[in-house]
Amino acid sequence: LTAKDQKTTFQSLVSDTLGEDCDYDTVRNIHDNLNELMAEAKESPDPLELSRPDVKHLLERSGVPEEKMEHFDKNFEEAVGEKNTLLASNIASVKTFQIETPDIIVKVNPERSDLVETREIDGRRCLVIAIDDHLEVNGIEVR
């Protein structure tokens, strides 16, 4: 699989595995845990390869419920192959953490994804972004 295909395949695996439970917190946990794995392997001369058990452990560690994992092995083998692996550098976004809606794109420092959460406010799903000190809109500092 090409790098782009690996990324698309991983995204589909996550989406298909989680189904209706594919929420912001779980996807953020997967992102954070994947980046943590890459940071731990940074000193190694070999690229970090993720086998089926590695990806399964990543998802479980990220809070994917056990009942959602029952078809994971079959889905991984169909999408990636029984003996094939995914390169972590192809499936992770270490430089950006991007949240999109049809009208809005929010880019967050990947190490600070904890500043963003989803909440229901007045019956609507909303992104809530913690602002610690400095806020700019189109280059203009606002209070």
Language-model region placement:
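Long, hydrophobic alpha/beta structural blocks
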Residues: 1-93
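C-terminal, beta-strand-rich globular interaction domains
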Residues: 60, 64-143
